[in-house]
Amino acid sequence: MIEEEITLKIPKSIVNQIDELIKEGYFSSRDEFVRYAVRESLTEIAISKKMSREECKKIWEEYKIRKKDIKIDEKEIEELLDEVDKEWKKWKKLKLK
């Protein structure tokens, strides 16, 4: 694999957190952490591109229109979707920090 060197400026508080993870044995170096974080971010973006929340909502709305022959507890599904939505919002807040 061809590698390219880049320079990053990261707040000291984040560097301290990275260093703590290295001390705890999660990563062997800052480089390893940054490569991991970049791969994880690219994976998350790729997944979200494949199916956004809006696409999920469209699928749900279409299902509600076509559900005539399906016996299913709609209230239970809506509660589950509400839970997923709450978790999504929590996750997004964590990612923005």
Curated annotation (Swiss-Prot):
SUPFAM superfamilies, alphabetized: Ribbon-helix-helix
Q: What is this protein called?
A: Uncharacterized protein MJ1679
User: For this chain's UniProt record, which GO biological process terms are given?
Assistant: regulation of DNA-templated transcription
CDD domains assigned to the protein according to its UniProt record, in alphabetical order: RHH_NikR_HicB-like
PANTHER family in alphabetical order? BLL4998 PROTEIN (PTHR36215:SF1)
Q: Which organism is it from?
A: Methanocaldococcus jannaschii (strain ATCC 43067 / DSM 2661 / JAL-1 / JCM 10045 / NBRC 100440) (Methanococcus jannaschii)
